[in-house]
Amino acid sequence: MIMRMTLTLFVLVVMTAASASGDALTEAKRVPYCGQTGAECYSWCKEQHLIRCCDFVKYVGMNPPADKCR
C-alpha cells in the first residue's frame, strides 16, 4: 500500500517537473506568429518575458541571432 502511494507521488512529481520545463516550447505551439526573421522572433520572445528564447526561435524553425545565441 505504501509502495503504491510512493510510486503515485513520484509519477506526479516527475510529470509536474517535465511540464514546467517545457513552458517556452508550449508557448511556441500556441503563438502562430512571432516575426519574419529569427531576430524578430527572438525580440518578440524577450518582450513576452519567456526564457530560453534561443531554443524557442529554433523550435519555430528560424535561425536565432548569432550575437545573442551561441
Curated annotation (Swiss-Prot):
Prosegment residue ranges: 23-30
Disulfide bond among keywords: yes
Keyword Signal: yes
Keywords (A to Z) from UniProt: Cleavage on pair of basic residues, Disulfide bond, Neurotoxin, Secreted, Signal, Toxin
Disulfide partners: C34-C41, C45-C53, C54-C69
GO cellular component: extracellular region
Molecular function terms from GO: toxin activity
Tissues in which the protein is found: Expressed by the venom duct.
Signal sequence extent: 1-22
Subcellular location: Secreted
Transmembrane regions listed in the UniProt entry: none
Domain notes: The cysteine framework is XXIII (C-C-C-CC-C).
Protein family membership: Belongs to the conotoxin K superfamily.
Described function: Probable neurotoxin.
The protein, known as: Conotoxin Im23.4
Organism name: Conus imperialis (Imperial cone)
Taxonomic placement: Eukaryota, Metazoa, Spiralia, Lophotrochozoa, Mollusca
